[in-house]
């Protein structure tokens, strides 16, 4: 599944079983994107400030758990849940003060535990996690658009915004 954006640019997107992410360390001088394929790469990106801002960190962490699910080699649901829990703990260590990080990780944890406890198959759990990560990102984008719509009236037309 590819998560499409209508914008010409993006800060993060899911494409071909990987997370593509703008490297914020180089902004505004240049746009550089990373392609992350493992939950460890996601954790390192959060730690190295590739991604900044609590909501964005939460979104990225959610996709990190999707990568953990897709990369797990576990053959049964209990081992699969343990793999996801290990990834969740690793991601939680990346930014201990980022509230959205823990909120997103908890939200994803509820998804996999609910599905696994109902003995649903792994493929369905993976798809459910991906859908939840996409929903977390969509909610954040909607919130940002609303902030912009409400804030535009506060900026005089003659102002220059950096």
What are these regions (language model features)?
Residues 1-47:
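Positively charged, low-complexity intrinsically disordered leader regions
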Residues 50-162:
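N-terminal active-site beta-alpha-beta segment that forms phosphate/nucleotide-binding
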